[in-house]
């Protein structure tokens, strides 16, 4: 991820809550922001475009499901971090308000370079395109919020050829390699 992307993350963190339930409390998450438009999408969701810097262009687009028996429910939040008009971060939520997926375009080319998957609001898998070539080549698997296994396609052939197993503290405890290109671990080291 480019270093200046990290400078824009405070915008994302103030604008994207951990769960959709937090976002339903108010129409705008950031002080001073302005709701530009509210409309209905073809699939019946309420689309809300939010301008954080009051330049007349939306940096955030929220997609809500309106409910009669409960407050509106945030299903998706799209964020334009670098203000180029393209989505840089997309967060998706389930009907319980829990995050289910988040995608980040770290090099601002219009393609997701990092995708996190969540179950019951906890991250379970991350897919990462480490060289920004459009193909995910690193996969991280989480247990209780901690990376416990990493799988990597280091030669770009579409098959996993390196594995790392980590303990609860994040230290590597075992590694493996595929040396013959069949996608199966041939060499194990502890």
Task: Give the residues covered by each predicted segment.
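Bacterial N-terminal signal peptides
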Residues: 5-14
